[in-house]
Amino acid sequence: MIRQIIVVEGKNDTKRLKSFFDVETIETHGMGLGKETIEVVRRANEKRGVILFLDPDAPGEKIRKRLNDAIPGLLNAFVMKEDARTKKKVGIEHASKEVLEEALSHLVSYEEDRQSLSKEEFYELGLEGMEDSAKKRETIARHFHLGKCNAKTLYRRMNLMDISYEEAKEVL
């Protein structure tokens, strides 16, 4: 059994996770994330801990940011978009058991005010402003289980996870 309560976007995500794992979930019902739901997540985090396991798309990232900003100490699980999609849809409910297990075994907790990587080092690694920057960002994101990110989000997540220039350079 997974001790923490997992926050997902909808009932199909809950069904998918429960088909493989003994878990309890809180559903945000998509972008309709109200104060009441945030308070439920806050209380759940105080009692048992919470894992945010949201879809690898723009709405999922907005919900993740809003919850992480409102509630310190949440754990985050990420899947890459290509690992959680059908021809027309993207979501946790489309990921395989192996992908879900992998994501849940690499949880990320955000701690603000860290800077293990300067903006200059980020550029020096070629993670922004180069022809192959998107490919390099994907390599880093996949290796450190950060989910698909644009440059700004990757920079923030790398610092929040305390990933150094040396660690990133080794991966690239």
Regions found by a protein language model. Name each.
Residues 1-5, 48-51:
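Short active-site oxyanion
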Residues 4-16, 20, 28-37:
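N-terminal, positively charged regions that mediate nucleic acid binding
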Residues 19-23, 31-172:
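TOPRIM fold recognition
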